Amino acid sequence: MASAGRAAVANLEDKPATVTVKMVNFTYSPDPLTVPVGTTVRWINYDDDQHNVVSDDKSFKSKLLDKNQDYSYTFAKKGTYRYICSIHPKMVGKVTVE
């Protein structure tokens, strides 16, 4: 879906869509991600350690997720949304909504 240095792009014909982001090896994948308005992003934790998803602008925030738990958020407005794992601050991601 994405290669190094390129954003993953959701299929624009499948609205509303759900796109999955994996939390694995202390990274979010794919990252960065570009989606159309109305897309739901579902983050799934595949690590043994807990992670969460916290946006810089506080528009979304998950609880701590154990392995195989997930969190979903539907992006209703265009913009760039940066997020982190609050317990692993070097774990960062970005969703661009077009």
Indicate residue ranges for each PLM-predicted region.
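Extracytoplasmic copper-binding redox domains, predominantly the cupredoxin/blue-copper superfamily
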Residues: M1-E98
